[in-house]
């Protein structure tokens, strides 16, 4: 029935064999086909870029995205899952620019947009085979063949429909606005994309500039940290209610206006200036000043070069006076609301000054800072220069500084649907739950209109055609609509193709498409519709698969994909796009830094899998903080520990069962005997049925952390309690009912455990299942149903009893270890103290287990600790402080004088009065801190309500028994080293040392039983292995397989 389990196991090799079994037998396909007609469980897979290889950051969500669909499939749902590729956008363009050795918008246009886009198309799926190989090797089941790509015409057409639907609802508009802008990419970014990048600490020049008040010999001292914006200065801002001082600078012989609170920053000596006048900012509002540069003098008639009041001005730094240019959102709004100035932006697409600013023409704006400063010096307008350290946003694609600039862009009106977004969020089950009201909820509350246009090339074009004569706009929502209006056949919706499509306007002009493409986040947010070509295909079935039952990605997607899914789902259908989401954290290198190929600070993921196995890696990841959206400092040693402490123990339990099942010719059946008499069998069966119940509840709630904790706790119970305590039942030669029950129980438990573990570690569970399954069972473990609890087999009372006993044993073993008393050395007495009568009853019922586990001869169960300890006491200052007040110091000395008898009375609830300065105080147990002092030869430990004591006095008889146990261990090791089978009987050879004679004479029967020895023989010639029984006690032994 069962195949023998090899003693040496190579888990990666097993996994490769299982992978071949799945592929050859199309097990994944069968898992979906067998659920045809069942309720569908909808899962959306966020599309990655295929321009880079998968890394640990991908492994976490891909593991989660495999666990849940496998589980739901085993729960009877049909879970279709398709891989997707994000094929448009800046990452692809950036890669092509590098390969073509070109950079920037102008060079791309010179190269040719059509040729550039063709290069993008060529590289966009560069690593798809590597992705498929890696993700499959991780054990994830997903359909790669029927994948979707955002560059597919069907996908792009659905995105046009999404855009048109929002446009027709009035939720999309075009406007001029200050936006974060990537000079290297020559395109604006959305605010949430800024948050996907990194804020770095950088030093910028901090300048204080002199602005001359018109027609007066007085200067405003204005502050800026962006010198490059000074050529476009159009105004100055002060705080309406801020106090300002007009001063005369004695050294410079000039008059300045400055925020009063900032005087001491600029003048260390108050005698260096004279205060002429003080006033509020409101007083100088509207005053005109002379521009420091003459590039835009024509703006004076439109309201430029005046003082404005603004709430954002402070005196925390600078001068309390700031210069205004249309390169900041607040500045832009002041100019827009208070002047009629043109929104001058004399910089090109790559943020180089144009010929409007002749002195700095062709310079990148940040590179112009020093030249501008030199110019100011030469004009005697630079009052002070310092350096300013501050956090500044960098582009998440190019890692270069962003520039804020006014630019025309298309927006989704988030403000109009904000309340609906918040309502949609209420419908989502977040795991971890704090994200709902925390990171994601707060992001929604503060969400701003979404800039969705990009001045780029390889993307989904914004489907708006504008009349060249009137500016009338037509928004297109399908290929058919575009063909009807233009009279041209449309096969490809990319920019280089549709930009050539024009048609005459009824107003006399020509309809030409607006030049921008869509933010690729708009496309990924459209994935639920576009991947299904909605509404052009299967429209009636769509609402059966929307919203998704489940999605999973990293924490950064709270401001990325989760956000755009929520926006578009709410805007289109007033519904969330997903019901449940598991969010993972970031995987860092072991030193806490970001994983980096250049730093080589992490192991290649495939090397990890080929060394330890995918199951070990999967389990390591889902056991870690990363599953709770916290960061994980990855280490190979962590995966190695999972292999050693979890995977191998599971294998050992399975190997133990198979070994004895083969020996005893055990024939399994899938029914469990409901009338078992052995308490261990009853307990472990109850435990696994309880585990089934818990796992079904917790995984249904998407709580993988709790699920894993429960599984690991059970594996420990199985190996370190049930199997260890049941070994002799398998060892005995006769096949009595107890042995049969042990086989049946272990078979049932291991098989059910594999079924429960299958979604988490699919390879190992498949390997074990293939050897355990009967002929009439499913071809693969993953085609089975997930185990459901048999309620009548659950015995909570028995579980609580056994857990209490395990706790007592654990505490006692820890006590032995802390005093270096090896478990093989027997002790005379163990004391267990508890006041709980139920616990005392359990101890009496199961004292034989405790004695065996602790290796003690006698157990004494007590209600108090009097026989074990003597007490001393210290004052509990926190409690006594309010009671004793000024008498606290004397009171603490009185408490230190309490006798053992005094303390016992307090423990037992009796009054104990102390008298201090004519005042009396009743001292209770909470007023003192107990100190336990062990009585002679006793070792004591206290945990919660239980105190354990061990009698550490070792008699000669106990000492010899301990040595006999040590001898047994040495013989067992020798059996393993010689590759003896567990059922092999042996002859044991020993030398003629006195100590060995004593041990074998007194414990011969015990030694024979434990080591399957049929004969012990004194034979120096054959006892050749030197072993240490105890400190400095060396003996020689040998073994030989028994043959009749």
Swiss-Prot record:
Family: Belongs to the class-I aminoacyl-tRNA synthetase family. IleS type 2 subfamily.
Keywords per UniProt: Aminoacyl-tRNA synthetase, ATP-binding, Cytoplasm, Ligase, Metal-binding, Nucleotide-binding, Protein biosynthesis, Zinc
Cellular compartment(s): Cytoplasm
Broad EC category: ligase
Function recorded in the entry: Catalyzes the attachment of isoleucine to tRNA(Ile). As IleRS can inadvertently accommodate and process structurally similar amino acids such as valine, to avoid such errors it has two additional distinct tRNA(Ile)-dependent editing activities. One activity is designated as 'pretransfer' editing and involves the hydrolysis of activated Val-AMP. The other activity is designated 'posttransfer' editing and involves deacylation of mischarged Val-tRNA(Ile).
Positions of short motif 'HIGH' region: 48-58
UniProt note: domains: IleRS has two distinct active sites: one for aminoacylation and one for editing. The misactivated valine is translocated from the active site to the editing site, which sterically excludes the correctly activated isoleucine. The single editing site contains two valyl binding pockets, one specific for each substrate (Val-AMP or Val-tRNA(Ile)).
Recorded GO CC terms: cytoplasm
Reaction catalysed by this enzyme: tRNA(Ile) + L-isoleucine + ATP = L-isoleucyl-tRNA(Ile) + AMP + diphosphate
Taxon lineage: Bacteria, Pseudomonadati, Spirochaetota, Spirochaetia, Spirochaetales
EC number: 6.1.1.5
Record protein name field: Isoleucine--tRNA ligase
Binding-site positions, ATP: 597
Cofactor(s), by name: Zn(2+)
GO biological processes: isoleucyl-tRNA aminoacylation
């Amino acid at each position: 029935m069962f195949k023998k389990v090899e003693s040496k196991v190579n888990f990666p090799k097993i996994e490769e064999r299982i992978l071949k079994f799945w592929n050859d037998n199309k097990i994944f396909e069968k898992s979906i086909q067998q659920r045809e007609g069942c309720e569908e469980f909808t899962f959306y897979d966020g599309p990655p870029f295929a321009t880079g290889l998968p890394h640990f950051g991908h492994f976490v969500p891909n593991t989660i995205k495999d666990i849940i669909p496998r589980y739901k499939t085993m729960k009877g749902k049909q879970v279709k899952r398709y891989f997707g590729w994000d094929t448009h956008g800046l990452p692809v363009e950036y890669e092509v620019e590098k390969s073509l050795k070109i950079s920037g918008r102008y060079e791309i246009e010179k190269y040719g947009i059509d040729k550039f886009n063709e290069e993008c198309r060529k590289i966009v799926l560069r690593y798809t085979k590597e992705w498929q190989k890696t993700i499959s090797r991780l054990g994830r089941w997903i359909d790669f063949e029927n994948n979707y790509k955002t560059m597919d015409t069907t996908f792009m057409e659905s995105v046009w429909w999404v855009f048109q639907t929002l446009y027709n609802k009035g939720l999309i508009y075009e406007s001029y606005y200050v936006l974060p802008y990537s000079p290297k990419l020559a395109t604006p970014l959305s605010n949430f994309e800024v948050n996907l990048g990194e804020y770095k600490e950088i030093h910028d020049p901090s300048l204080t500039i002199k602005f001359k008040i018109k027609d007066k010999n007085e200067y405003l001292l204005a502050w800026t940290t962006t010198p490059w914006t000074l050529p476009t200065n159009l105004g100055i801002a002060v705080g309406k209610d801020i106090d300002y001082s007009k001063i005369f600078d004695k050294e410079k012989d000039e008059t300045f206006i400055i925020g009063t609170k900032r005087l001491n920053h600029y003048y260390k000596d108050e005698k260096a200036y004279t205060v002429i006048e003080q006033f509020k900012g409101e007083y100088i509002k509207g005053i005109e000043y002379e521009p420091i540069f003459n590039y835009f003098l024509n703006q004076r008639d439109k309201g430029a070069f005046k003082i404005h009041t603004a709430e954002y001005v402070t005196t925390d730094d600078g001068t309390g006076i700031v210069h205004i240019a249309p390169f900041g959102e607040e500045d832009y709004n002041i100019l827009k609301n208070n002047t009629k100035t043109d929104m001058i932006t004399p910089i090109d697409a790559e943020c180089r000054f144009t010929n409007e600013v002749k002195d700095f023409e062709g310079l990148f704006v940040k590179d112009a800072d020093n030249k501008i400063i030199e110019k100011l010096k030469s004009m005697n307008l630079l009052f002070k220069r310092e350096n300013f350290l501050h956090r500044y946003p960098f582009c998440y694609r190019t890692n270069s500084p962003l520039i804020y600039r006014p630019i025309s862009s298309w927006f989704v009106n988030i403000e109009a649907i904000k309340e609906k977004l918040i309502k949609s969020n209420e419908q989502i089950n977040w795991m971890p739950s704090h994200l709902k009201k925390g990171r994601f909820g707060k992001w929604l509350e503060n969400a701003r209109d979404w800039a969705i246009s990009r001045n780029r090339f390889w993307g989904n074009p914004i489907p708006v055609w504008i009349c060249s004569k009137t500016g009338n706009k037509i928004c297109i929502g399908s290929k058919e609509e575009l063909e009807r209006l233009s009279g041209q056949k449309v096969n490809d919706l990319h920019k280089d193709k549709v930009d050539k499509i024009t048609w005459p306007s009824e107003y006399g002009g020509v309809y030409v498409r607006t030049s921008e493409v869509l933010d690729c986040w708009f496309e990924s947010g459209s994935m639920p519709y576009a991947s299904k070509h909605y509404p052009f295909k299967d429209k009636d079935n769509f609402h059966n698969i929307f919203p998704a039952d489940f999605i999973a990605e990293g924490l950064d997607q709270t401001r990325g994909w989760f956000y755009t899914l929520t926006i578009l789902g709410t805007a289109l259908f007033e519904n969330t796009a997903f019901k449940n989401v598991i969010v993972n954290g970031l995987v860092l290198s072991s030193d806490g830094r970001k994983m980096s190929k250049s730093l080589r600070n992490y192991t290649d993921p495939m090397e990890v899998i080929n060394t330890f196995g995918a199951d070990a890696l999967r389990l390591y990841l889902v056991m870690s903080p990363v599953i709770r959206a916290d960061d994980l400092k990855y280490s190979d040693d962590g995966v190695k520990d999972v292999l050693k402490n979890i995977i191998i123990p599971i294998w050992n339990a399975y190997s133990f069962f198979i070994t004895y099942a083969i020996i005893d010719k055990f024939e399994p059946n899938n029914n469990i005997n409901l009338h078992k008499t052995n308490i261990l069998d009853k307990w472990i069966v109850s435990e696994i049925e309880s585990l089934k119940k818990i796992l079904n509840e917790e995984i249904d709630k998407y709580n993988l952390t709790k699920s894993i904790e429960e599984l690991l706790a059970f594996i420990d119970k199985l190996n370190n309690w049930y199997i260890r305590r049941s070994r002799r039942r398998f060892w005995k030669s006769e096949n009595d009912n107890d042995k049969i029950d042990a086989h049946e129980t272990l078979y049932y438990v291991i098989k059910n455990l594999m079924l429960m573990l299958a979604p988490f570690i699919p390879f190992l569970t498949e390997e074990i299942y293939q050897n355990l399954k009967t002929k009439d069972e499913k071809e693969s473990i993953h085609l089975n149903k997930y185990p459901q609890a048999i309620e009548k087999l659950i015995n909570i009372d028995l579980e609580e009893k056994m857990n209490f006993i395990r706790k007592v044993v654990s505490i006692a073993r820890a006590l032995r270890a802390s005093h270096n008393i090896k478990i093989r050395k027997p002790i005379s007495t163990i004391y267990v103290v508890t006041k709980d009568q139920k616990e005392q009853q359990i101890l009496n019922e199961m004292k034989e287990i405790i004695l065996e586990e602790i290796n003690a001869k006698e157990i004494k169960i007590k209600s108090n600790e009097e026989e074990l300890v003597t007490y001393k006491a210290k004052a509990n200052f926190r409690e006594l402080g309010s009671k004793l007040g000024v008498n606290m110091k004397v009171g603490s000395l009185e408490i230190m004088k309490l006798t053992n008898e005094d303390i016992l009375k307090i423990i037992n609830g009796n009054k104990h009065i102390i008298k201090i300065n004519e005042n009396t105080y009743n001292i209770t147990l909470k007023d003192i801190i107990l100190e336990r002092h062990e009585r002679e030869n006793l070792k004591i430990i206290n945990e919660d309500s239980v105190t354990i004591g061990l009698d550490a006095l070792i008699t000669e008889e106990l000492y010899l028994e301990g040595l006999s146990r040590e001898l047994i261990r040495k013989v067992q090791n020798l059996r393993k080293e010689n590759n003896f089978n567990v059922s092999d009987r042996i002859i044991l050879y020993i030398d003629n040392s006195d100590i060995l004679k004593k041990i074998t004479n007194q414990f011969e029967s015990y030694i024979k039983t434990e080591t399957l020895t049929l004969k012990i023989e004194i034979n120096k010639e054959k006892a050749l292995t030197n072993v240490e029984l105890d400190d400095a006690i060396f003996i020689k032994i040998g073994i030989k397989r028994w043959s009749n």
